[in-house]
């Protein structure tokens, strides 16, 4: 059983929901990436999604695009992201880390080389936005063989066939995109999310995390009432953007802690 699967199993036994915050590696500068990862854990993160900056992040809204631009301007690369995970692991052997990004940097490194390097660094999962499950069978198989969970996106428009493809190729959890469009945009339709989550869970047999459109403790709590995990990214990037550098980590911890506390007031949590 993978570290991600073990985390969800533990949380389920506690009646708790997973909190999965996202930051972009290298933003606001590479020296803050590892401290910010520890700050997320201090705030109550169960799993960290670490963004690999890319020059054309098609699924990301302006906030995460800006984070990618800042990181790339500082010289952040996939290999440097892996080095950051390695450094994080020297102080935290337990918190699962999922790399989230795009195919181009992985293809440049080579899929097999990426899988090996990611596992060696201490990465637990990879969510590659433009790797549809039906087209990356070899990557998914190689990832699973190495103990790396391949994680896939589902959306309100996803078909039953896509559910089946994701169930076959994926492991760890599903990232359900709760809005049509890009990250950080729009408003949540909670009724639609609540209707879709049981369908997805039954079809894929994995925990379902919901992201896109979650901006505060209240929206996180509302999503946590129906999902297995809450994914929050753009709002954390905004917190980093508006913070003086020396206060970024403490401000991020404070913000994440508020989300964690809201999730832990949901019915069913075993105190």
UniProtKB/Swiss-Prot annotation:
Pathway(s) annotated for this protein in UniProt: Amino-acid biosynthesis; L-tryptophan biosynthesis; L-tryptophan from chorismate: step 5/5
Keywords attached to this entry: Amino-acid biosynthesis, Aromatic amino acid biosynthesis, Lyase, Tryptophan biosynthesis
Does Amino-acid biosynthesis appear among the keywords?
Answer: yes
Which residues carry out catalysis?
49 (proton acceptor), 60 (proton acceptor)
Q: Does the keyword Hydrolase apply?
A: no
The EC designation for this entry is 4.2.1.20
Q: Name one Pfam family in it.
A: Trp_syntA
* Membership in a protein family: Belongs to the TrpA family.
NCBIfam families named in the record: trpA
Q: What is this protein called?
A: Tryptophan synthase alpha chain
Protein's organism: Azoarcus sp. (strain BH72)
Origin organism lineage: Bacteria, Pseudomonadati, Pseudomonadota, Betaproteobacteria, Rhodocyclales
């Amino acid at each position: 059983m993978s570290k991600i699967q073990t985390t969800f199993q533990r949380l389920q036994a506690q009646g708790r929901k997973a909190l999965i915050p996202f930051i972009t590696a290298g933003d606001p500068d590479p020296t803050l990436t590892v401290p910010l990862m520890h700050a997320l854990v201090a705030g109550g993160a169960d799993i960290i999604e670490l963004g690999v900056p890319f020059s054309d992040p098609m699924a990301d809204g302006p906030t995460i695009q800006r984070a990618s631009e800042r990181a790339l301007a500082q010289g952040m690369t996939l290999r440097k992201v892996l080095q950051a995970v390695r450094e994080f692991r020297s102080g935290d052997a337990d918190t699962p880390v999922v790399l989230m990004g795009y195919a181009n940097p992985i293809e440049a490194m080579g899929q097999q080389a990426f899988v090996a390097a990611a596992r060696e660094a201490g990465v637990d999962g990879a969510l590659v936005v433009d790797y549809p499950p039906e087209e990356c069978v070899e990557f998914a198989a190689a990832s699973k063989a190495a103990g790396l969970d391949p994680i896939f996106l589902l959306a309100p428009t996803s078909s039953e066939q896509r559910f089946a493809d994701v169930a076959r190729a994926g492991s760890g959890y599903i990232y359900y995109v709760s809005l049509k469009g890009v990250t950080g945009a729009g408003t949540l339709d909670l009724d639609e999310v609540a209707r879709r989550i049981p369908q997805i869970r039954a079809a894929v047999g994995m925990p379902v995390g919901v992201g896109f459109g979650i901006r505060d403790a209240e929206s996180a709590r509302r999503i946590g009432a129906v999902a297995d995990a809450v994914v929050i990214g753009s709002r954390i990037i905004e917190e980093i953007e508006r913070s003086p550098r020396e206060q970024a980590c403490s401000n991020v911890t404070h913000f994440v802690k508020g989300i964690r506390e809201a999730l832990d007031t949901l019915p069913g949590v075993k105190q």
